[in-house]
């Protein structure tokens, strides 16, 4: 089918990209980021064509189709799950759970969430000055309640043992360095930050991910997919990150141009959209996106290549597979699989924005302490 330009009726899709520059401020290198509008892409879709997007279920063995004939990935998808990234050692070589084991795991998770919601104490008097008032309970989180639909014991499918590959000697040295350990300690709350330079971009409400990897978090696990003949746009609920993936065959950016989420290019391989992401900015992912947060133990380098595969496997399911290849970090590539489920939404605003008051108030409180 010949591809044509279609427009989404009465809608304008504004694409936001993140660029960053390095600046030298009093001898310290800091990352400054600015969100700029790089494009406003408008496509017209006649009402009948829009209805076709919703109703065209495709032929036998085919996923739903867009008016221009590509598999239709559009919609609001959720990937919350209690399945861990790595297989628990207690499961050995067991790759899949039985139905009974999956039900038992989900029951244990439900009991854990219920217990976490139980008040630890009921206070009638204020705490002494400096007392711990606690934090969010599981009412405020959305970690998922079920194992992945495939019943896998881990999101990692390769290596077959469900574990991350061995780190290279170079990676071991990186994560053992004092600078790395310092940032990890600040991130994990073991020590306070010395200044704003040690606060991550997610705490500034600027950016959450260092690469395009879609993995479940503690909450806000929704992703809104928008699709045109030439692009796929993914709006992530968490810190409202936006990925713009070109599908028009253009080459990757020159290796000298590095971006927060790297540079993504997509192509169709039958029913599957294959996306390759390169050009990740190494200082960013090291300082502000230490990968234990989403990828397990390790430290990505600027040589990382991320290959993602999106496949509609049913009216309400989208399979997401990813392969991480970083020869400077792991001794071999590794692959994970994460089925996503359609959700009706709506996806609410993530009310976190650049220039919010959190960091300013933290700094003001710290300076007040210094002045005592």
Each model region followed by its residue ranges:
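Bacterial N-terminal signal peptides
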Residues: 12-14, 34-46
């Amino acid at each position: 089918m010949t591809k044509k330009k279609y427009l989404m009726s009465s809608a304008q899709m504004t694409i936001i990209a993140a660029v960053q520059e390095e600046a030298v401020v009093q001898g310290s290198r800091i990352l400054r980021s600015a969100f700029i509008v790089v494009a406003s892409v408008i496509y017209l879709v006649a009402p009948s064509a829009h209805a076709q997007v919703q109703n065209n279920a495709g032929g036998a063995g085919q996923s739903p189709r867009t008016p221009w004939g590509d598999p239709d990935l559009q919609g609001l998808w959720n990937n919350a799950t209690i399945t861990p990234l790595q297989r628990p050692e207690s499961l050995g070589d067991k790759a899949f759970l039985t139905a009974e084991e999956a039900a038992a795991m989900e029951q244990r998770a439900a009991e854990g969430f219920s217990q976490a919601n139980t008040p630890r104490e009921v206070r009638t008097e204020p705490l002494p000055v400096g007392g711990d008032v606690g934090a969010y309970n599981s009412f405020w989180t959305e970690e998922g309640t079920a194992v992945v639909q495939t019943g896998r014991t881990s999101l990692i499918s390769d290596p077959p043992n469900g574990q991350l590959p061995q780190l290279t000697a170079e990676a071991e040295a990186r994560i053992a360095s004092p600078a790395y350990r310092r940032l990890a300690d600040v991130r994990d709350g073991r020590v306070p930050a010395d200044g704003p330079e040690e606060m991550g971009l997610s705490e500034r409400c600027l950016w959450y991910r260092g690469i395009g990897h879609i993995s479940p978090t503690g909450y806000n696990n929704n992703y809104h997919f928008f699709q045109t003949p030439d692009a796929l746009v993914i709006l992530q609920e968490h810190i409202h990150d936006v990925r713009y993936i070109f599908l028009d065959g253009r080459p990757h950016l020159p290796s000298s141009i590095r971006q927060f989420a790297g540079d993504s290019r997509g192509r169709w391989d039958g029913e599957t959209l294959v996306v390759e992401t390169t050009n990740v900015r190494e200082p960013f992912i090291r300082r502000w996106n230490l990968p234990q947060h989403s990828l397990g133990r390790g430290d990505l380098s600027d040589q990382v290549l991320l290959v993602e595969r999106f496949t509609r496997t049913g009216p309400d399911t989208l399979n997401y597979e990813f392969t991480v290849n970083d020869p400077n970090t792991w001794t071999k590539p590794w692959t994970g699989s994460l089925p996503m489920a359609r959700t009706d939404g709506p996806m609410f605003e993530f009310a976190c924005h650049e220039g919010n008051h959190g960091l300013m108030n933290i700094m003001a409180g710290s300076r007040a302490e210094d002045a005592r």
